[in-house]
Amino acid sequence: MIQSMTGFGKSQLQLAHKKIIIEIKSLNSKAIDLNTRIAQAYKEKELAMRKLISDTLERGKIDFTLTVENTSETSTSSLNESIIRGYIEQMRAISPNGPDVEFLKMAVRMPDALTTPVEEVDEAEYVQIEGQLVIALKHLQAFRCSEGAILQKDFELRIGNIQQLLVQVETLDTERLAAIRSRMEHAVEEIRARVDENRFEQELIFYLEKLDITEEKVRLANHLNYFLSTLEEPQSNGRKLGFIAQEIGREINTLGSKANHAQMQQIVVLMKNELEKIKEQVLNIL
């Protein structure tokens, strides 16, 4: 079962005087690319949280935020009066006739005007936070699975379209080879008397073998089936699907170069169109 790398997970933890909010977002990336924004009080646990996220999600561009909302009726912050007075005095020196009320409004917004005590986080609280992180990760993984199921249906549809086009190639191939043989025989009809018959047949067979696409058709059919079977594997493997898609592309390109038949080349163009859509979506598979 495939998974998308796109996902979102969220969880919340209500404690005595605060609420912890955890959010994780994921987009596609070749490797794990983890960005974190963590409230200062929990910075010492950042490495442990990063490891848990990386081990769980494996790949993707991940944005992880842990924020704290104060739910207490009293504020834990206090005004740093000496610093605020210092700011106001500097403003008065610059503008002696300025209003003190406006100076105060500006001063309380300046750096270090508010003091918030550093909160100690005990191990029991972190265990609860880690539990909520696990829940958020599960929500994100469920999102990835849901997106993966949608992508899988799209892959199956497009692989099926290529398989149907390959059936049309099979139907046209006999006609194509007969037409090529006829054109060649007609082209040399005037000089046939001067050409050894056996030699002519040998050259004709050699040329037709160069245009033969039997092996390409067989390999393409095998690659298409392999892609479908890989979709059903227990573990999502976007890299493997990408490699198979490359092999499918090689066989389709060879069909196009050997075709020498207008209708068959049109079919090859349709195959390439379906494959490009597959390749775009494979980039988002875990």
Predicted segment positions?
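N-terminal intrinsically disordered, cationic/polar leader segments
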Residues: 1-286
